[in-house]
Amino acid sequence: MADLKVGSTVGGSVIWHQGNFPLNSAGDDVLYKSFKIYSEYNKPQAADNDFVSKANGGTYTGPITINYGVNSYLQLSNNETPIRIRSGGGTGNTLVVGGSSGGISFRPAGSEITTGQITITPEGLTTFTRAVTAPSITVTSTPSAASDVTRKDYVDGAINTVTANANSRVLRSGDTMTGNLTAPNLFSQNPASQPSHVPRFDQIVIKDSVQDFGYY
């Protein structure tokens, strides 16, 4: 039997022993020189190693980079089409947000607060819950519904087109009519002073009335 002692070797290598390979147990842990040895039983924990845990979450203090490409994205799982955020465009300089059947909702006041929410449906319809302020809004379609936003050319065309129907215009600043004017009553703020003026009621003598003109 070989006599094992400090410095004994096997095949030229020093035999490990408590002195040169210190292993110690601490409960269910095994320590090497006071350092914990991880194993299949004792796996690394996020809190011990500054990891972000799949189960417990965590906080990144530095940037997270997702490389450009159709297969590189941040995905939010659901029971339908996955919701994804990725870079798009020819060089990855476009933000692409892919929604599902419920559309996309932007909530400026908080993820659980619908005040001020902006919703985009899968059909491309956008709904605002508050007023929209912009230097200009461009409408590419001719309005058809009563609630549609109209276009300047549509309004200008309706105003500037003078026809013989009810859309014919009379300028408030003064105008000349080529047809008869019929109204229940006409109110004149000033009395007639020229032969072409229409007289007011207080300037005429009522038919069949008795007038006392006095003595001449």
UniProtKB/Swiss-Prot annotation:
Q: Which UniProt keywords apply?
A: Host-virus interaction, Viral attachment to host cell, Viral tail fiber protein, Viral tail protein, Virion, Virus entry into host cell
Record keyword Plastid present: no
Q: GO:BP terms for this protein?
A: symbiont entry into host cell; virion attachment to host cell
A Pfam family annotated for this UniProt entry: Phage_T4_gp36
> Which coarse location class describes where this protein primarily resides?
virion
Q: How does it assemble?
A: The distal half-fiber contains two molecules each of Gp36 and Gp37 and one molecule of Gp35.
Q: What is this protein called?
A: Tail fiber protein p36
Species of provenance: Enterobacteria phage Ox2
